[in-house]
């Protein structure tokens, strides 16, 4: 086997280091979106979850309500998601812009919600689905990226929304 000359490690140039930092930041902000949604689908929204995705003064905005501040965010989320037997959120098209210690993120989301009761007579047979656009601002903290603001805009719905479901028990 011929000898291969050893090439010593060469540190990245400042430009390469900055480019790698931007890529890592963009992935970290995308992961923040995924952590938020995974917590919803796993019904794992406790105080630790809230602090892992929101800043102390973080704000959540949705057409049907919202909440300001990490204190109480888990309870608010539990009340919002607790209406459903299960949920499944799929996000795509993440656009992330990093500006130093701040970031903006946006994308599309399809959320599928299963009604509390299985389909049956007088019960909706279909899940309730929502197509959303999301937009948020994140801040780099000592613990990593956290949402300072996260907002959703409903684009379309399909199925029976909560509050309009009427069940008749036999």
Residue ranges of predicted features:
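Transmembrane beta-barrel outer-membrane domains
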Residues: 86-87, 127-129
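Short beta-strand edge/turn micro-motifs at domain boundaries
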Residues: 2, 104-106, 129-164
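A solvent-exposed, acidic/Ser-Thr-rich amphipathic alpha-helical stretch
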Residues: 46-113
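Short, low-complexity N-terminal intrinsically disordered segments enriched in polar/charged residues
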Residues: 1-46, 52
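Short, surface-exposed loop/helix-turn segments at secondary-structure junctions
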Residues: 117-124, 164-165
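Extracellular/periplasmic carbohydrate-active domains that bind, remodel
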Residues: 108-120, 131
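Short beta-strand segments enriched in hydrophobic/aromatic residues
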Residues: 40, 54, 109-111, 151-154
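Short, P/G- and charge-enriched loop/turn segments at secondary-structure junctions
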Residues: 81-83, 121-126
């Amino acid at each position: 086997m011929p000898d291969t000359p050893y090439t010593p490690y060469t540190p990245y140039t400042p430009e390469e280091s900055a480019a790698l930092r931007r890529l890592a930041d963009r992935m970290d902000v995308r992961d923040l979106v995924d952590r938020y949604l995974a917590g919803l689908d796993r019904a794992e929204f406790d105080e630790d979850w809230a602090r892992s995705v929101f800043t102390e003064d973080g704000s959540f905005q949705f057409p049907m309500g919202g909440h300001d501040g990490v204190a109480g965010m888990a309870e608010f989320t539990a009340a919002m998601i607790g209406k459903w037997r299960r949920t499944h959120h799929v996000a795509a098209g993440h656009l992330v812009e990093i500006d130093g210690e701040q970031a903006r993120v946006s994308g599309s989301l399809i959320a599928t919600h299963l009604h509390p009761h299985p389909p049956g007579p007088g019960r909706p047979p279909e899940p309730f689905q929502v197509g959303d656009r999301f937009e948020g601002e994140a801040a780099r903290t000592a613990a990593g990226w956290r949402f300072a603001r996260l907002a959703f805009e409903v684009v379309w719905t399909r199925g029976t929304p909560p509050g309009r479901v009427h069940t008749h028990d036999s």
